[in-house]
Amino acid sequence: MSRKAIGIDLGSTMSEVAVIEGGEPKVMLTTEGSRTFPSVVAIDKKTGERKVGAPAKRQAIMNPKNTINLVKRFMGRKFDDPEVIEAKKHIQYDIVNHNGWAYIQIEGKEYSPQQISSWILAELKKMAEDYTGETITDAVI
C-alpha cells in the first residue's frame, strides 16, 4: 500500500494543501469551498477554544488581541529585529520578548511563532486526511 504525501504552502496570510491524484497535484477545498485557507489562529477568550482558518478570521473584529495573523513574519526572528518592529505596527495582538526571541502572548501565555504555525499545519493535515480518508504521514512544506 502506498503512502499519500501532501504538499503545503504555508503563507503569511493564506495557505493551501494539495495531494497527488492521477499523477497531478489537486489543491483541496476548505469546508467553505475555497482553495485557500486563512493563516489565522484565535483563542476564544471565554472558552479557551482554539479556532483555525476561516472561523478564526471571522471572529477577529470581536477578539483582536487573541487573533493571530501574519505569524510567519515572526518565525526565527529576534524581538528587536527591524522586521518585527515594523510588523508590530500592523497587528493588534502582543509580541513579547522571550529570551530575545519574538513570541506571541495570548491570554497571558507565550507561544513561539512556530507553535502557532503548527496549529495551522495540523488543521491542513486534518483537511487532507478527511479528503483522502487516509492517515497522512508525509508532507512537503
Residue spans for each PLM region:
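N-terminal phosphate-binding loop and flanking beta/alpha elements of the actin-like ATPase fold
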Residues: 1-38, 44-141
